């Protein structure tokens, strides 16, 4: 069959990798590179070159089994990294890094701060109580994180300086949106990733040489069928197949795989079905401004508080997530220069220290979106169309691979 695949992120490339075995595929990519959120940038400092990841960075040995199996098939090497999380609040001056006891009290005054100790106690209480509530079915499907925190009487320091900014950093969502986040979804993710345990946590990893190292081997078997700078403009379907309108004109296909974002897929459909409107319309995305730079002022004031992920508080709770990734820690970069990737903080960065600007869209989760996710199978096959993407689950690389495998199963293909 002739199959059009729209999008070349992890979902699109995995779909193409599998479907290319027996079918005639064409991958349409609007950008001038393939990989989607996997975008490694080469920079040079003091005569040395470094490959810095600006989108997809980390994965772990607990919750990425299919992605790791794919890397194994491709012969792509990876190495362990350190995952740690810090919060800094310019208003109160509070900052900490949860990596160790020493870094937790990087700001030594926290040792004698009752509010800080209340936060620590509530971290331990939340980790214990929320798992017990989940296991004993005491979390209603309609309950949000904010409702649970209020009902449980958790202190404001725990809410505002720990659990909500951590969620905002993970899903690139505003603090307000995190308060409205579906609690069951939140707790299952935190439990599965060891985030509700002090000691029992997965080993996080990065791909050696940068995340983009898997792109060439993954696409090698079909690279001649990839069209860069070729955005799809409209998709029409009829009883016999699919018409794809792109900058190349009109082309006819038997099937189409939408491996782009949910909102993009819905916008491309000339005549979306009621199910497509309802399901895809509930799966929202939001843009995040991303800057690669060397301005360490966006990290905590005390170097001991520098973590892999660093959340900066301040401003209204509705503003987009403000997180900075310390790439030297994450990628094990040996350099006197500290490379940072910051979300939604462009105005605070010294312009002369900016190495690159990018924009990535991330799924925005809600009670409606979780309900829509459960209906994925309804959009696999009808009208010769298949939809895949990380938005069908937690929004990460493993989820993109799993969604592509669901599509591939309909064509009798598997990893």
PLM feature segments, named:
Residues 2-27:
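N-terminal Rossmann-like FAD-binding beta1-loop-alpha1 element of flavoenzymes
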Residues 11, 33, 263:
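Conserved Rossmann-like nucleotide-cofactor binding loop
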Residues 20-44:
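Glycine-rich FAD pyrophosphate-binding loop
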Residues 41-67:
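N-terminal glycine-rich dinucleotide-binding loop that anchors FAD/FMN and/or NAD(P) in oxidoreductases
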Residues 42, 99-100, 318-415:
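Conserved flavin/dinucleotide-binding core of flavoenzymes
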Residues 61-180:
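Mobile amphipathic helical/loop "lid" adjacent to a hydrophobic cofactor/ligand pocket
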Residues 188-246:
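Helical element adjacent to the flavin cofactor pocket in flavoenzyme catalytic cores
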Residues 231-361:
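Mid-domain catalytic core of redox enzymes
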């Amino acid at each position: 069959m002739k199959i059009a695949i729209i999008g070349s992120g992890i979902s699109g490339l995995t779909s193409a990798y599998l479907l290319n075995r027996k079918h005639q595929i064409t991958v349409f990519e609007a950008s001038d590179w393939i990989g989607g959120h996997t975008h490694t940038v080469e920079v040079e400092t003091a005569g040395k070159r470094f490959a810095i990841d600006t989108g997809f960075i980390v994965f772990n040995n607990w919750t990425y089994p299919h992605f790791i199996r794919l890397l194994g098939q491709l012969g792509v090497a990876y190495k362990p990294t350190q995952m740690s999380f810090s919060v800094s609040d310019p208003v109160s001056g509070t900052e900490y890094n949860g990596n160790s006891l020493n870094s937790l009290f990087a700001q030594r005054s926290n040792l004698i701060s009752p509010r800080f100790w209340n936060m620590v106690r509530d971290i331990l209480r939340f980790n214990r109580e929320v798992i017990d509530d989940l296991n004993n079915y005491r979390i209603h499907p309609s309950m949000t994180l904010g409702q649970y925190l209020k009902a449980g009487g958790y202190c404001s320091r725990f809410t505002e300086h720990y659990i909500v900014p951590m969620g905002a950093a993970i899903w690139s969502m505003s603090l307000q949106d995190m308060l409205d986040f579906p609690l069951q979804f939140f707790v299952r993710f935190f439990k599965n990733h060891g985030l509700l345990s002090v000691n029992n946590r997965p080993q996080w990893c990065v791909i050696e040489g940068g995340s983009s190292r898997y792109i060439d081997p993954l696409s090698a078997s079909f690279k001649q069928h990839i069209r860069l700078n070729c955005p799809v403009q409209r998709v029409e379907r009829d009883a016999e197949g699919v018409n794809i309108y792109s900058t190349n004109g009109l082309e006819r296909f038997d099937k189409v795989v939408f491996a782009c974002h949910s909102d993009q897929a819905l916008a491309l459909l000339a005549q979306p079905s009621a199910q497509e409107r309802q399901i895809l319309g509930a799966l929202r995305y939001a843009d995040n401004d991303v800057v690669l730079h060397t301005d360490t002022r966006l990290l905590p004031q005390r170097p001991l508080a520098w973590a892999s992920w660093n959340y900066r508080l301040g401003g209204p709770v509705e503003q987009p997530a403000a997180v900075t990734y310390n790439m030297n820690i994450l990628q094990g970069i040996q350099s006197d220069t500290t490379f940072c990737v910051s979300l939604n903080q462009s105005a605070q960065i010294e312009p002369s220290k900016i190495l690159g600007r990018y924009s990535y869209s991330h799924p925005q989760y809600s009670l409606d979106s979780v309900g829509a996710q459960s209906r994925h199978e309804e959009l696999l096959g009808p009208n010769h169309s298949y939809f895949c993407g990380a938005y069908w689950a937690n929004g990460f690389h493993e989820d993109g691979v799993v969604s592509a495998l669901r599509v591939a199963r309909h064509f009798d293909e598997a990893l």
